[in-house]
Curated annotation (Swiss-Prot):
PROSITE patterns found in the cross-reference section: HELICASE_ATP_BIND_1, HELICASE_CTER
E.C. code: 3.1.21.3
Protein's UniProt keywords contain Membrane: no
Identification of the protein by name: Putative type I restriction enzyme MjaIXP endonuclease subunit
GO BP, one annotated term: DNA restriction-modification system
Family per record: Belongs to the HsdR family.
GO molecular function: ATP binding; DNA binding; helicase activity; oxidoreductase activity; type I site-specific deoxyribonuclease activity
Function: The restriction (R) subunit of a type I restriction enzyme that recognizes 5'-CCAN(5)GTR-3' and cleaves a random distance away. The R subunit is required for both nuclease and ATPase activities, but not for modification. After locating a non-methylated recognition site, the enzyme complex serves as a molecular motor that translocates DNA in an ATP-dependent manner until a collision occurs that triggers cleavage.
Keyword vocabulary terms for this entry: ATP-binding, DNA-binding, Endonuclease, Helicase, Hydrolase, Nuclease, Nucleotide-binding, Plasmid, Restriction system
Catalytic activity, as annotated: Endonucleolytic cleavage of DNA to give random double-stranded fragments with terminal 5'-phosphates, ATP is simultaneously hydrolyzed
UniProt-listed SUPFAM superfamilies: P-loop containing nucleoside triphosphate hydrolases, Prismane protein-like
InterPro entries to which the protein is assigned, alphabetical: Helicase_ATP-bd (IPR014001), HsdR_RecA-like_helicase_dom_2 (IPR055180), P-loop_NTPase (IPR027417), Prismane-like_sf (IPR011254), Restrct_endonuc_type1_HsdR_N (IPR007409), Restrct_endonuc_typeI_HsdR (IPR004473), SWI2_SNF2 (IPR040980), T1RH-like_C (IPR021810)
Domain Helicase C-terminal: 551-731
């Protein structure tokens, strides 16, 4: 069951105390989330001010366009930097508030450098030129900083005068807006995603506020996420910890991902957990200092990265300061599932560890087991740490370790090897602040090479990161690195939306080859040798028999044809990329030739290493320089590029992220973590990608099962889901949906005339329109069926249900069209992740139902006319009639209220009353239809009163507004009519001007004219004139909404 808004409101009382609960009851429900957040932050020691108190009038800032609270800022930096004079503090303020760069991201980066490193200040003291850095935040003495939370903080548009935006909540540290919150009420029809969209809108209008923000938070009370100002929605994360990454228990998750938690025995919402975890003062300061990096965008840590790095650094300090034996210098192992940002976690670790005083500027040596991985990791780090070194040889590594006082070095593990068995690896240094950090630390050779590491650097400490589970049967990894520091498994990552699920499909099973070879004792090439094509080829002789079969014309013909047919059908549903994994370079080249012969083959490339002076001539087009490979990788990663498919052998199977990659075809036997790493290429989050698909042409499922048998059942289950499971669930859901339409023949609906089809859909609509619960259930089932269909495509089982699914989609669209906002919200939420896919594959055609057909047949009739209402009421399917009438009235009232709320607001309230009476079964369907028809007639009559008075629609709106003021000295309605006409006539001249609503000079003229008209009619009270003229102007903006 979904978590209810009522449950949220109930828990608010638990979270914020009885006093606040009583106060919350008095508040508009729209502000419940906001006020709960304020109270939680006050409990955490934050000061509070309403935004109306942080204005120029209160001397908090110079203008509404300013985002930094000037006086608080100057007071804080003088407190943190006692040597700072008032004059110099003002100079710092001007520097921070005048960041000169046209690019929003660059302004954010420049400010973050000021925030962390201080503001460079050049000044003269006693005639001597000096340079010092001014701290904006005291990261060491937290209590020296001022923490302030403010709601409804009003900021003027950056590019336009007189228009304002008010973020729901802003957290200031020392007068600087560090975090911005947007909320939606849990009882509204909007969600946290809508709050995210609000951020994006406000960011365009008031960028001068958002350029300082490091954290954006969105919440509807039930779902809460945070991200950076440059994050897309799929990079907004949950926060699921208070003091560590495992101290919060999930007690309830609904269909939309909304979560309830338990912490120390008490229930909490997601918003409370985020505030208690991330916005605890000590945590927030630490987060700002150590867990934000700028690359092309601002990247901020997830909760599991934050707590993991904190623990890893604490253990590092203990190891360096107190580790007397090799066992004491084992820091531990970080296991974070594939696709969850392991490289970024390592980067945050480096950033934090390097500045720890206890470590005395340590030397961090990052080790990988392949040149490709070494280069990838180095490239990630070098954009942040320009001083990072990369060892190209054993001798260079030894020299760097001897001479480098501290910093970062990258190398492959093989550089700790020996050229011959008789050679001894030399002693390098006895420093104790060298940290060996292994990437993917479960290769068997770490145990052997660790001996050389210990001899060379006897006092080094050891830390490991891995993306696949460690084999508990092989204790060598734990003997070298220690036990787990943190584990972030794939099931959590999927629940948090950090990765997408992976599905498995076996195709051309008759061609599967590995069963007879599965027991061959071969090591993965990527684990055993350096990046040398000749050496690789000699080892690959083990695969000779397999390769020979795969090079036959029959095999290549069948596989190449099937790959292209399968992938092109996938592209019909969602755009993206594919990767084909082959056993050898020869198979890769031959398969490329066959694939490019296929009709409608996409643009494709082979990615492999080689040497043109030694390799066969047909290899040459596929052997690229380093720069050419970089350009090819860039092209493949670009979702908009024409390069849709690559064929690989070993390269790009680990550490290579292509979020738009959604399909992998395997023609290569793989084992253990190498297989787990390879298939994880397709689990990256990208827009509305529903999942990744592994297509097996060789039999890796058996190998995967054997390889993962040593891991927990959870790890095996979460790694991959067989497409057969999806097919079975699709069939079950299909049967569920068809059960709504028993004895209705819809199978040949595409052959029906428009009139017959409209009658059929209304008949089908009647079956699912009994009540809101039935409608919700139907909508959920159809959307679930669509998702399963998309995941299963292009499996043959999907062909038979495609037409039926399109019919179900038509009925679902009718339900959403003629139903309450809540049902529309459910549909929007559930389909959010597949929105762009639907139109490509299974979108229902635009249906002209009975109501739409009636409007087409009799376009001269108003939808509120007696004749039209009579025609609608004659339709035999009364649930449909009821919903259509509600839709007509809702739409009509909404349009009329926008222009004349005074006259038509009462009808909106009446409509809601009728709907509520029906909901609680006070009236029947027939009685409800009768009341709705009567209400429609009253609305029509109210609208026609203007004609009887000789007033246009616009004049009537002004007329109603003027009559609504009880103390206006106008008792003669004829005089009011005259004023309304004069106002409308005056406005007709101004509205012709382009952008009249935005031009300040025109607005001033209009307001002045309105005041003159009112004074001319005998209104003397100037405050009343101001009030009425302001209201009339706002009315005019709605009336003339052009």
């Amino acid at each position: 069951m979904p978590i209810s808004a009522n449950k949220y409101f109930l828990l608010v009382g638990v979270f914020i105390g009885d006093k606040m609960k009583k106060e919350a009851a008095k508040l508009n429900e729209d502000y419940v989330v906001e006020n709960a957040a304020i109270q939680r932050l006050k409990n955490l020691g934050y000061s509070y001010k309403h935004g109306s108190e942080l204005t120029p009038e209160y001397n908090e800032r110079e203008s509404y366009r300013d985002a930094i609270l000037k006086n608080r800022f100057i007071k804080a930096i003088k407190n943190i930097n006692p040597w700072l004079t008032e004059e110099l503090a003002l100079k710092v303020y001007k520097t921070v508030t005048n960041i000169d760069n046209p690019d929003f991201n660059m302004r954010g980066k420049i400010f973050y450098e000021m925030l962390i490193n201080g503001v460079k200040l050049e000044f003269k003291e006693n005639g001597e030129k000096k340079t010092r850095f001014v701290k904006l935040i005291d990261f060491e003495n937290i209590n020296k900083n001022e923490f302030l939370v403010a709601n409804q903080f009003e900021v003027e548009y950056y590019y336009e005068n007189g228009r304002f935006r008010r973020p729901d909540l802003v957290v200031f540290i020392n007068g600087i807006p560090i975090a911005i919150f947007e909320f939606k009420s849990p009882k509204s029809n909007q969600t946290a995603k809508d709050a995210f969209n609000d951020h994006k809108t406000k960011m365009k209008d008031i960028p001068q506020l958002y350029q300082y923000a490091q954290i954006l938070v969105v919440s509807d009370g039930l779902e809460t996420k945070y991200g950076s100002p440059t994050s897309d929605w799929d990079r907004f994360f949950v926060w699921e910890g208070v003091e560590s990454d495992d101290d919060v228990e999930v007690i309830e998750v609904d269909n939309y991902g909304n979560t309830m938690y338990k912490y120390k025995g008490n229930p909490y919402t997601s918003l409370d957990i985020l505030l208690m975890g991330l916005f605890k003062k000590e945590h927030l300061i630490e987060f700002l200092e150590d867990f934000i990096i700028h690359d092309k965008k601002k990247i901020i840590a997830t909760y599991y990265q934050f707590y993991t790095v904190k623990k890893a650094v604490d253990r590092t300090i203990k190891s360096v300061l107190y580790g007397e034996t090799p066992e004491d210098r084992r820091i531990g192992i970080v296991w974070h599932a594939q696709g969850t940002g392991k490289s970024i976690t390592m980067l945050f670790y480096a950033k934090k560890a390097l500045k720890q005083k206890e470590l005395n500027y340590p030397l961090l040596v990052f080790l990988t087991d392949r040149l490709e991985l070494d280069e990838q990791l180095y490239n990630v780090f070098s954009s942040v740490f320009s001083e990072a070194e990369r060892a190209e040889s054993i001798a260079e590594l030894q020299e760097l370790i001897k001479k480098t006082p501290g910093g970062i070095i990258f190398a492959t593990i093989q550089k700790f090897g020996r050229k011959s068995k008789d050679e001894h690896y030399p002693f390098l240094t006895d420093r104790n602040n060298i940290i060996i950090i292994a990437d993917e630390a479960h290769r068997s050779h770490y145990g052997t090479l660790a001996q050389n590491l210990r001899k060379a650097i006897p006092n080094a400490s050891f830390l490991a990161f891995t993306a696949t589970p460690i084999d508990y049967k092989d204790r060598s990894t734990f003997l070298v690195f220690g036990d787990y520091i943190s584990a972030y498994p794939i099931d959590k990552a999927k629940r948090h939306g950090v990765v997408v699920p992976i599905y498995y499909e076996a195709r051309l099973v008759e061609l599967h080859l590995t069963n007879e070879f599965i027991d061959l004792e071969f090591d993965e090439i990527s684990e055993r040798v350096a990046n040398d094509p000749e050496t690789k080829e000699s080892i690959k002789e083990v695969f000779a028999k397999l390769e020979k079969i795969m090079l036959t014309e029959d095999y290549l013909s069948k596989v190449s044809k099937d790959i292209i047919e399968h992938f092109n059908k996938r592209l019909q549903d969602f755009d993206g990329k594919a990767m084909v994994v082959t056993i050898s370079r020869k198979v890769a080249v031959e398969l490329y030739k066959w694939i490019t012969k296929q009709p409608n083959a996409p643009k494709i490339a082979v990615v492999m290493s080689g040497n043109k002076s030694k390799d066969p001539e047909d290899f040459h087009p596929h052997i690229r320089t380093k720069k050419e490979l970089e350009n090819l990788a860039k092209e493949f990663k670009d979702p908009e590029s024409d390069l849709k498919m690559v064929i690989v052998v070993d390269m790009w199977l680990t550490g290579f992220d292509v979020p738009c990659l959604h399909t992998m075809y395997f023609l290569k036997p793989m084992k253990n973590h190498s297989l787990a790493q390879a298939i994880a290429r397709v689990n990256r989050v990208f827009k509305d990608k529903p999942g990744g698909l592994i297509v097996d042409y060789i039999g890796i499922a058996d190998d995967l099962s054997k390889s993962l048998s040593k891991y927990s059942s959870e790890a095996r289950k979460d790694l991959m889901t067989d497409i057969k499971v999806v097919i079975e669930e699709m069939k079950r859901r299909y049967e569920k949906v068809t059960s709504y339409f028993k004895n209705i023949n819809y199978k040949d609906w595409k052959k029906l005339s428009s009139e017959d089809l409209s009658l059929l859909t209304v008949k089908a609509y009647q079956r699912v329109a009994k009540d809101d619960n039935t409608k919700k259930e139907f909508v959920r089932n159809v959307i679930a069926l669509k998702k399963l269909y998309l995941l299963a495509r292009p499996h043959p089982e999907t062909i038979g249900i495609k037409d039926d699914l399109e019919f179900f989609e038509m009925i679902k669209k009718m339900i959403v069209k003629y139903s309450t906002k809540k049902i529309r919200e459910i549909s929007q939420d559930l389909e959010n992740d597949i929105q762009s896919l639907i139109s490509k594959s299974i979108s229902a055609k635009e249906l002209v139902d009975v109501f739409e057909m009636l409007k087409k047949e009799k376009p001269e009739l108003s939808v509120l006319s007696d004749e039209f209402l009579s025609e609608i009421a004659k339709i035999e399917y009364k649930d449909y009639v009821r919903d259509v009438l509600i839709k007509i009235l809702n739409d009509d009232i909404r349009v009329r209220m926008a222009k004349n709320p005074i006259r038509f607001k009462k009808f909106s309230e009446r409509l809601n009353e009728v709907i509520e009476k029906y909901r609680i079964k006070v009236i029947t369907t027939a009685e409800m239809i009768e009341e709705l028809v009567n209400l429609a007639k009253e609305i029509r009559k109210a609208a026609e009163e203007g004609k009887e008075l000789g007033l246009t629609e616009e004049e009537l709106a002004f007329y109603d507004l003027l009559l609504s003021y009880p103390n206006i000295p106008l008792t003669d309605k004829k005089r009011v009519e005259k004023i309304a006409k004069e106002i409308a006539r005056m406005m007709s001249g101004y509205i012709k001007a382009r952008d009249w609503k935005k031009k300040k000079n025109l607005q001033s003229k209009i307001r002045a004219k309105l005041k003159i008209i009112l004074m001319k009619e005998g209104i003397k009270d100037y405050s009343l004139i101001n009030k009425i003229s302001d209201d009339l102007f706002e009315y005019a903006k709605n009336i003339y909404a052009i």
